[in-house]
């Protein structure tokens, strides 16, 4: 399909079950542990934990996984790790973050979890070294 005028094709991501065997089992994907990805402020609801796991398993360019989470019972604040490659931001950062956030939303739909994605100006204005606040996910109990 042609792309809209002024836009160019950048990336494609397939969803669904494979016809044959996967080229790599999920356990060999070398994803960061929950302990490295999350700062737990409260014990999360099971639903909140399901969404974090979906985000943790999201693919990223060069397996960079440029995200961190601050976790509460029914909410999760998403931060982008500000990694620099040669002094400038990776061109793939926004795509990586978008894929991860799409994984959260797809998991919410799959598991029938009612969520709202929000943005907190207060969090966005707080400087956190090497991190940029992206948004928050609220889980409705």
Report the location of each language-model feature:
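Acidic, surface-exposed loops and disordered segments
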Residues: 1-141
């Amino acid at each position: 399909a042609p792309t809209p005028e002024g836009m160019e094709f950048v990336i494609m991501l397939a969803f669904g079950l494979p016809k044959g065997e996967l080229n790599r089992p999920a356990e060999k994907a070398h994803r960061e542990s929950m302990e490295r990805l999350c700062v737990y402020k409260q014990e999360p609801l099971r639903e909140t934990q399901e969404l974090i796991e979906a985000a943790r398993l999201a693919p990223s360019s060069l397996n960079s996984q440029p995200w961190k989470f601050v976790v509460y019972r029914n909410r999760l604040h998403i931060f982008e790790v500000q990694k620099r490659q040669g002094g400038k931001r990776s061109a793939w950062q926004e795509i990586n973050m978008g894929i991860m956030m799409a994984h959260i939303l797809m998991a919410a739909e799959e598991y029938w979890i009612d969520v709202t994605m929000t943005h907190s100006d207060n969090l966005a204005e707080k400087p956190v070294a090497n991190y940029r606040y992206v948004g928050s996910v609220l889980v409705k109990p």
